[in-house]
Amino acid sequence: MASLNKLSSNEIGNIDRQIAKLRQGQILTEQEVKSLCIKAKEILQDEPNIIQVRAPLTICGDIHGQFHDLIELFQIGGNLPDTNYLFLGDYVDRGSQSVETFSLMLSLKVRYKDRIVLLRGNHENREINKIYGFYDECFRKYGNEIVWKQFTEVFGYLPLSAIVEQQIFCAHGGLSPAMESVDQIKQLNRVQDIPHEGLMCDLLWSDPEETKNGWGISPRGAGWTWGCDITEKFLHSNKLKQIARAHQLVMEGIQKVHNQKTITIFSAPNYCYRCGNQACIVEVDEQLKMNQTQFEPAPRENEPHTTRRVPDYFL
């Protein structure tokens, strides 16, 4: 099956040129996006809902269209194919360069498909990114909605979760009262818009609760909050050791709760160009030891100075 997706030398040359073009801050042509999305779907449709991932690798949280900070992330973490990456979703919306960001992510996936895993986040969904910036950005940069439609079609093929060395469960949001076993994720039809409720929704929308046990109503209007007791039960039942997720702005770029068994990773520094937060990536070595690296925003011209402050609750 993998051989069907092997790139020819001509295709490798083309994708390398596209990666170089994107790194220079140029957008792809409409035809280049179309070809990229076709190839990406061929690769992604062969991936299961739960990706089994080997260490060593680097886990990254939300990017949200902050393209310069994504380039900085690769500078810090290492470029592909020298470093293996697992991204936890939310590549688009809010930031001003979602087009460049997701174009680069997909190009890297096509070029180094076994070295990078791209999970789906709650913003990889038409209903959300039509409101929070991605649709408008695509229209502004291409003059129509064709590219947006092509990208959003790819979103449905992104896997929903990953497990690192059969011990670390990874998803964008978190747990679900509808899930006792991770095997239930395998049964989901992921090639669709994110439902408003149920297991698929919760994987991408839920948040851990620091101070309360049990399940709670999420202030986001989708997903749930879950307590330390839920984490302990889930990990024990599935013979896992930790949960790694993204989805929430945390001011230090990383936060560990539930006896350090639930880890939130956020990789967009100075989120929305105004929150003043640090970002973080987490390297996991062969012994599953985690090494966190925090970083500040990449330098930009004409960007206002921001002071660190506790942010509003973001969707």
Swiss-Prot record:
<comment type="similarity">
    <text>Belongs to the PPP phosphatase family. PP-2A subfamily.</text>
</comment>
<keyword id="KW-0464">Manganese</keyword>
<keyword id="KW-0479">Metal-binding</keyword>
<feature type="binding site">
    <location>
        <position position="247"/>
    </location>
    <ligand>
        <name>Mn(2+) 2</name>
    </ligand>
</feature>
<dbReference type="InterPro" id="IPR029052">
    <property type="entry name" value="Metallo-depent_PP-like"/>
</dbReference>
<feature type="active site" description="Proton donor">
    <location>
        <position position="123"/>
    </location>
</feature>
<protein>
    <recommendedName>
        <fullName>Serine/threonine-protein phosphatase PP2A catalytic subunit 2</fullName>
        <ecNumber>3.1.3.16</ecNumber>
    </recommendedName>
</protein>
<feature type="binding site">
    <location>
        <position position="172"/>
    </location>
    <ligand>
        <name>Mn(2+) 2</name>
    </ligand>
</feature>
<feature type="compositionally biased region" description="Basic and acidic residues">
    <location>
        <begin position="298"/>
        <end position="315"/>
    </location>
</feature>
<dbReference type="InterPro" id="IPR004843">
    <property type="entry name" value="Calcineurin-like_PHP_ApaH"/>
</dbReference>
<feature type="region of interest" description="Disordered">
    <location>
        <begin position="294"/>
        <end position="315"/>
    </location>
</feature>
<keyword id="KW-0488">Methylation</keyword>
<feature type="binding site">
    <location>
        <position position="62"/>
    </location>
    <ligand>
        <name>Mn(2+) 1</name>
    </ligand>
</feature>
<dbReference type="GO" id="GO:0004722">
    <property type="term" value="F:protein serine/threonine phosphatase activity"/>
</dbReference>
<keyword id="KW-0904">Protein phosphatase</keyword>
<dbReference type="GO" id="GO:0046872">
    <property type="term" value="F:metal ion binding"/>
</dbReference>
<feature type="binding site">
    <location>
        <position position="122"/>
    </location>
    <ligand>
        <name>Mn(2+) 2</name>
    </ligand>
</feature>
<dbReference type="InterPro" id="IPR047129">
    <property type="entry name" value="PPA2-like"/>
</dbReference>
<dbReference type="GO" id="GO:0005829">
    <property type="term" value="C:cytosol"/>
</dbReference>
<keyword id="KW-0378">Hydrolase</keyword>
<feature type="modified residue" description="Leucine methyl ester">
    <location>
        <position position="315"/>
    </location>
</feature>
<feature type="binding site">
    <location>
        <position position="90"/>
    </location>
    <ligand>
        <name>Mn(2+) 1</name>
    </ligand>
</feature>
<dbReference type="GO" id="GO:0000278">
    <property type="term" value="P:mitotic cell cycle"/>
</dbReference>
<dbReference type="InterPro" id="IPR006186">
    <property type="entry name" value="Ser/Thr-sp_prot-phosphatase"/>
</dbReference>
<dbReference type="Pfam" id="PF00149">
    <property type="entry name" value="Metallophos"/>
</dbReference>
<dbReference type="GO" id="GO:0005634">
    <property type="term" value="C:nucleus"/>
</dbReference>
<feature type="binding site">
    <location>
        <position position="90"/>
    </location>
    <ligand>
        <name>Mn(2+) 2</name>
    </ligand>
</feature>
<feature type="binding site">
    <location>
        <position position="64"/>
    </location>
    <ligand>
        <name>Mn(2+) 1</name>
    </ligand>
</feature>
